[in-house]
Amino acid sequence: MGLLRIPLYRLYERRLERALSNAPKPRHVGVILDGNRRWARLSGLSSPKEGHRAGAEKIFELLDWCDEVGVQVVTLWLLSTDNLARPPEELEPLFEIIENTVRRLCNEGRRVNPMGALDLLPASTAQVMKEAGTTTERNPGLLVNVAVGYGGRREIADAVRSLLLEEAAKGTTLEELAERLDLDDIAKHLYTRGQPDPDLLIRTSGEQRLSGFLLWQSAHSEFYFCEVFWPAFRKIDFLRALRSYSVRQRRFGC
């Protein structure tokens, strides 16, 4: 960033902050952290790992920005179930970065909720995720959902499976369950059970699709698609997303 652009950037940032001071803000923000590999390639870096590492650092900036505006829940989609099919030479360093990121979240006192098919992850990564959820569950402040090995359809299937097992343990027959089953019964078994549904979903890198992110929970969410790659995501990009959200008239229907 040039010397002239730095003060202009700060002025614009403060202008956005003033405009948002009394505006409605989301309680729950979901973010698809997209574009790490493309950012690394366009930046002339030697491997995708460098993009993933830069993207991991950006997470901590985002959480600070969320703290500043009073967001209560952030859901971060770090790795999808589809991504698990990538070559081992890319996944191995990525899992290491994810483990280090989750440990740092714990060390900084964040409340971490692991989301995803942990049984599909390497044992060490799954263990780090599980321990984070257990050791930080009573931490105050911002709740950070960390989605690794996550897929929206898989989450719904897991929720239904969990519900069926719970009801079977009570002796409920399938006919009895089918008779009284409603949406809340399934929602109580989602990875985000007990949390508010996301108000705002952000995807970086210019892709304009959700790819199944929070498929059940996003029925009434507002979407914001940002052109920049995740490692280059700035505070003004976040504030612009909040500004866009603040002027929308939310309709909880068609």
UniProtKB/Swiss-Prot annotation:
Pfam families with a match to the protein in the record: Prenyltransf
Effect recorded for residue 59 to L: Able to incorporate E-GPP, Z-FPP, and Z,E,E-geranylgeranyl diphosphate (Z,E,E-GGPP) as the allylic substrates. Changes in the product chain-lengths
Free-text comment on the cofactor: Binds 2 magnesium ions per subunit.
Gene3D superfamilies: Decaprenyl diphosphate synthase-like
One Gene Ontology term from the biological process aspect of the record: polyprenol biosynthetic process
EC numbers for this chain: 2.5.1.68
Gene Ontology cellular component annotations, sorted alphabetically: plasma membrane
Site entry (Important for determining product length), positions: 78
Residues reported to bind Mg(2+): 34, 222
Keyword Transferase assigned: yes
InterPro entries, A to Z: UPP_synth-like, UPP_synth-like_CS, UPP_synth-like_sf
Catalytic reaction equation(s): isopentenyl diphosphate + (2E)-geranyl diphosphate = (2Z,6E)-farnesyl diphosphate + diphosphate
CDD domains cross-referenced by the UniProt entry: Cis_IPPS
Binding of substrate, residues: 35-39, 52, 80-82, 86, 203, 209-211
PROSITE patterns: UPP_SYNTHASE (PS01066)
A molecular function GO annotation: Z-farnesyl diphosphate synthase activity
Necessary cofactors: Mg(2+)
Enzyme class of the recorded protein, top EC level: transferase
Keyword Secreted belongs to the record: no
Swiss-Prot/TrEMBL site (May play an important role in product chain-length determination or in allylic substrate recognition mechanisms) positions: 59
Keywords for the protein's UniProt record, in alphabetical order: Magnesium, Metal-binding, Transferase
Active site residues according to the UniProt entry: 34, 83
Quaternary structure and interacting proteins, as annotated: Homodimer.
Family as reported in the entry's similarity comment: Belongs to the UPP synthase family. Z-FPP synthase subfamily.
Function noted in UniProt: Catalyzes the condensation of only one isopentenyl pyrophosphate (IPP) unit in the cis configuration to E-geranyl diphosphate (E-GPP) generating the 15 carbon product (2Z,6E)-farnesyl diphosphate (Z-FPP or EZ-FPP). Only geranyl diphosphate (GPP) can be used as isoprenyl acceptor.
UniProt name for this protein: (2Z,6E)-farnesyl diphosphate synthase
